[in-house]
Amino acid sequence: MTADRLNLGCGTDVRPGFVNLDSAALPGVDVVHDLNVLPLPFEDESFAEVVCQDVLEHLDYAPLLGEIHRVLRPGGRVWIRSPHFTSRAVYLDPTHRTAFSVDTLRFFVRGDAFAERSYYFPFHFSRLESARITFHRYRAMPWNYAVEALVNRSPAAQAYYEGTFLGRLFPASNVEVTLVK
C-alpha cells in the first residue's frame, strides 16, 4: 500500500490508486477497519487526499474528522459527501445518525465565522476550498438542474436556500465539501 490517497468507507466504490478502507471485507478493499474504532491504522500525515463519500452521517463524525486531519499531509485535501438535511435519504436509512448543512463542516475551519466554539476540538483545517449543495437529477425533476445552479451561485444563495421555504419546496440530495489541512 504505497498510495497517498485514501478512500475512507469505500464499500463497493473501490478506486484504483487509493488505499480503499471499509469495515467489510469486500472485494478490492485494502484495509478492513471499523471507523467507530479510532485511531485509524495509518501514520500521521500519510495521505495527500482523502475521499469520504457517504460515511460521516453514519458515525460520531467529529472524532473521525480529527483522525482524517491527523493522517492528511499539510496542504492535503479531504472531499466529503453527506446527505443534506432536506434529503429524504436522511430518514430512509436507519443507520444515518446525522444530516448536514452546507455550513456544518465550516465549524472545523480555523478563523471561520462558524468556528466560534472550535475550542472543543484540538484540530482545525486551514480552509474550506469548496462547498456545494447537490440535487437529484432525474428526468422527472428537470427543475433541479436550474435550482442547483442558482443555489450554488454564492454562499449567500446557499444560506437563503437553507433558511427559507425553498429548502422544503426543492429538497436537496447531498452536501459536498472540500477541506484543506
Residue ranges of predicted features:
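Conserved SAM-binding loop
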Residues: 3-86, 179
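S-adenosyl-L-methionine-dependent methyltransferase catalytic module, highlighting the catalytic core
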Residues: 60-67, 73, 77-181
